[in-house]
Amino acid sequence: MKRLLSTLLIGIMLLTFAPSAFAKQDGKRTSELAHEAKSAVLIERDTGKVLYNKNSNERLAPASMTKIMTMLLIMEALDKGKIKMSDKVRTSEHAASMGGSQIFLEPGEEMTVKEMLKGIAIASGNDASVAMAEFISGSEEEFVKKMNKKAKELGLKNTSFKNPTGLTEEGHYSSAYDMAIMAKELLKYESITKFTGTYEDYLRENTDKKFWLVNTNRLIKFYPGVDGVKTGYTGEAKYCLTASAKKGNMRAIAVVFGASTPKERNAQVTKMLDFAFSQYETHPLYKRNQTVAKVKVKKGKQKFIELTTSEPISILTKKGEDMNDVKKEIKMKDNISAPIQKGQELGTLVLKKDGEVLAESPVAAKEDMKKAGFITFLKRTMGDWTKFK
């Protein structure tokens, strides 16, 4: 059982949250947002609130939107220091043999992680995706295991990966909702939009094989605020897109599966984004990695450890509603004791209004904490004993 560490009234002016505002859709207007797609979903990034959905849990071929998970695992490896942007990645014969969209890597060719990430995010390179999979995990098969493990960690119930590219393969599927959650997780790493939000760039500059990259997501150029995330197309999947756009404090993620043409795909995503920004607004409360509390640690080298947010935390409301305040609660896990690793989840931050939960998000250790040595532990025990003497 979890115990309540603290309850703090946040004296901030926020718009009133009404659960029915998100459960009820605005009739005819929302029914026409993605009427040509097989499935679609619209969420707000910080809160994950679903603003619109159409068959969003249907299992369908995701095509190259698969690379959202591929990029997520790359960004995680970078964040944990397992790889660096400057690392050289050598292309295997297997990676170079990938068909479909590619950056035409040759066996033995080397590019940096940064260059490979450009090739994946901008040009949807299948060869670059497999090269990075092999670089991180040793083989494509081991990387796919990581992809499915991460999907399970994120609670995705309608996703199964067979490759890191999205090329058609039996048993390879996802859903609009699951894809939106993957994009939500990827966008925690804000630097990813430097890649996904770039419309054109070059690889192999200053060589006779200079290669022009043009983003397959045309909305980056034509819809203000769009900076990601990934398109997809195969004969089975048809035209797909997971798009992200930011306006003011609000970031929306719109996903479309199975549109008949690129024009139709972009039009439906545009309608969803327009709807999100015209009807809702986001109120940021915490940035990612912001310190929110500290907790006592048993047997630690230090007595207390600071807790930080694991993602941006905001409240989403309909526009024009009344203002009110919000309560913050931090529910800690029982028996927190050293050793503790940086980033280890130690509790949950809960935001409530009038008893209704508005948002929940994990809080994690700000830094590593080793177990106290014998001398430290003895001094602390003696100090505690003298206090009660």
Swiss-Prot record:
The keyword GTP-binding does not apply. Transmembrane segments: none annotated. It comes from the Bacteria. InterPro entries: Beta-lactam/transpept-like, Peniciliin-bd_prot_C_sf, Peptidase_S11, Peptidase_S11_C, Peptidase_S11_C_sf, Peptidase_S11_N. It is found in: Secreted. The keyword ATP-binding does not apply. Keywords: Carboxypeptidase, Cell shape, Cell wall biogenesis/degradation, Hydrolase, Peptidoglycan synthesis, Protease, Secreted, Signal. GO terms for molecular function: serine-type D-Ala-D-Ala carboxypeptidase activity. It catalyses: Preferential cleavage: (Ac)2-L-Lys-D-Ala-|-D-Ala. Also transpeptidation of peptidyl-alanyl moieties that are N-acyl substituents of D-alanine. Residues 1-23 form the signal peptide. Its EC number is 3.4.16.4. Pfam families: PBP5_C, Peptidase_S11. The active site is at residues 64, 67, 124. Pathway: Cell wall biogenesis; peptidoglycan biosynthesis. Belongs to the peptidase S11 family. Removes C-terminal D-alanyl residues from sugar-peptide cell wall precursors. This is D-alanyl-D-alanine carboxypeptidase DacF. It comes from Bacillus subtilis (strain 168).
